[in-house]
């Protein structure tokens, strides 16, 4: 019988191999996985049902361009992301982040954590997150 620690380690190795270029996402996954070891020790049925494999893979990731016109009339283009992680308990819910550092790894990390935040509300909502590397600082409303 597989222990919780063995299961978590095995799944995390697969996640690392598939997401090696996403350090923020991997850090969040590792922290959550470590905290779940006692759960898998107490409920081995979750291991049999591959709960972590289903939880850690987003249902959908959308990458898109965000064109906008600056105050000089020049078209600028930024990148946007929407990660929809889990609709198991309801429709996706999660905010938007606008910051120059935003990338797919950051949005995946935030969307992954949103699953757990939303589940604690008692509302039937799933987890997702969106954002863009657009920096709103110093931009006009024009």
For each of these PLM feature ranges, what is it?
Residues 1-142:
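N-terminal ligand-binding/catalytic initiation module
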């Amino acid at each position: 019988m597989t222990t919780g620690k063995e299961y978590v380690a095995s799944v995390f190795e697969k996640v690392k191999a598939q997401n090696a270029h996403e350090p923020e996402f991997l850090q969040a996954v590792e922290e959550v996985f470590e905290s779940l070891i006692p759960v898998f020790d107490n409920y081995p049925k979750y291991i049999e049902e591959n709960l972590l494999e289903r939880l850690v893979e987003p249902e959908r990731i959308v990458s898109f361009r965000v064109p906008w016109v600056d105050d000089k009339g020049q078209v600028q283009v930024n990148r946007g992301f929407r990660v929809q992680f889990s609709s198991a308990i309801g429709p996706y819910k999660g905010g938007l982040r606008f910051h120059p550092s935003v990338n797919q790894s950051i949005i995946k990390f935030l969307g992954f954590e949103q699953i757990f935040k939303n589940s604690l509300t008692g509302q039937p909502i799933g987890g997702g997150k969106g954002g863009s590397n657009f920096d709103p600082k110093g931009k006009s409303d024009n």
